[in-house]
Swiss-Prot record:
Gene Ontology molecular function terms on file: methionyl-tRNA formyltransferase activity
Lineage: Bacteria, Pseudomonadati, Pseudomonadota, Alphaproteobacteria, Hyphomicrobiales
Catalytic activity: L-methionyl-tRNA(fMet) + (6R)-10-formyltetrahydrofolate = N-formyl-L-methionyl-tRNA(fMet) + (6S)-5,6,7,8-tetrahydrofolate + H(+)
Pfam families according to UniProt: Formyl_trans_C, Formyl_trans_N
Keywords assigned by UniProt, alphabetized: Protein biosynthesis, Transferase
NCBIfam families (alphabetical): fmt
Coiled-coil ranges per UniProt: none
UniProt protein name: Methionyl-tRNA formyltransferase
Gene transcribed to yield this protein: fmt
Length: 309
């Protein structure tokens, strides 16, 4: 017999864990997700989150409050009488009253090796920092920012070409496996929790808009990490001189290349090899504003480039 759960999550990253819990036979009596967001040019269409769509496809009741800080919303949550709340990239603050309501507690799946990269963007920050490994951790939540005691963890390597999208997909599925294992152990009364270390704490703040623009005076290795960390969303960008006209282009894929250096921003003829402040980088995937995502060969067939800036 499975546990009575509530699930709290918002992006695509959370969906495999929701599906895994259902497949394991747990009774998810309610799903919480952030409210639908406006989309389209005029913002007239409201788009539900991936988690809301997934829950509704399984006929699970969905709640999308703007906040959980009010007595009304906390009472509504208490009425669910859940054993455990599972939290995966929900994005809303859980006050003490919510944390203390489930019979066995609130458990969070976090995509880093805590206490490194506490906060909102652990996958992106790990890649941008050049970390060689990261992982997934299941922790019992407390009132701090990702400070809870650890129930389970698993580490994986970050290669020199791993993108945030690839890493997110891997960690999400690892998180699903760990969450099922954790709940099984918890249900048997055998779960052991380990407090986090007080050393080597770092914070993964949200990605700022200014961090998405490529500065070609930076080393090629730095730019390569930046592109990988922000691919596919929000994506890095730069301006390109295409047939004498300045155009904004989103850069979604790259690789480091060796060779002699030239002035910063120089593009090798018939290629997308760009010279940086130190070293060179080859752009492998990019997208003009309003256009399709293209590989470098397809892009070059329709563009005459001179410089980037």
């Amino acid at each position: 017999m499975g546990l009575r759960l509530s699930f709290m999550g918002t992006p695509h990253f959370s969906v495999p864990i929701l599906h895994a819990l259902l497949d394991a036979g747990h009774d998810i009596v309610a799903v919480y997700s952030q409210p639908p967001r406006p989309a389209g040019r005029r913002g007239l269409k409201m788009i539900p989150s991936p988690v809301q769509n997934a829950a509704q496809a399984k006929s699970i009741p969905v709640f999308t409050p703007q906040t959980l800080k009010t007595a009304e919303k906390q009472a509504q949550f208490a009425e669910l009488a859940v054993d455990v709340a599972i939290v995966v990239a929900y994005g809303l603050f859980l006050p003490k009253a919510i944390l203390e309501t489930p019979r066995l507690g609130c458990f969070n799946a976090h995509a880093s090796l805590l206490p490194r990269w506490r906060g909102a963007a652990p996958i992106q920050r790990a890649i941008m920092a050049g970390d060689k490994e990261t992982g997934m951790m299941i922790m019992k939540m407390d009132e701090g920012l990702d400070t809870g005691s650890i129930a389970l963890s698993r580490s994986i390597p970050i290669t020199d070409n791993t993108t945030a999208d690839e890493l997110s997909n891997k960690l999400s599925h690892i998180g699903a496996e760990l969450m099922i294992e954790m709940l099984s152990t918890l249900e048997k009364g055998q779960l052991k929790l380990t407090p986090q270390s007080g050393e080597n704490i770092t914070y993964a703040s949200k990605i700022k808009k200014e961090e998405t623009r490529i500065d070609w005076t930076k080393p090629a290795e730095f730019i390569h990490r930046q592109i990988r960390a922000l691919s596919p969303f929000p994506g890095c960008w730069c301006n390109m001189n295409i047939a004498g006209r300045e155009e904004r282009v989103k850069i979604l894929g790259s690789r480091l290349t060796k060779g002699p250096s030239r002035e910063i921003g120089w593009i090798e003829p018939n290629s997308l090899i760009i010279h940086c402040g130190q070293g060179r980088i080859e752009i492998t995937s990019l997208q003009k504003s309003g256009g399709k995502i293209l590989d470098s060969a397809a892009f070059l067939r329709g563009a005459r480039l001179s410089t980037v800036f």
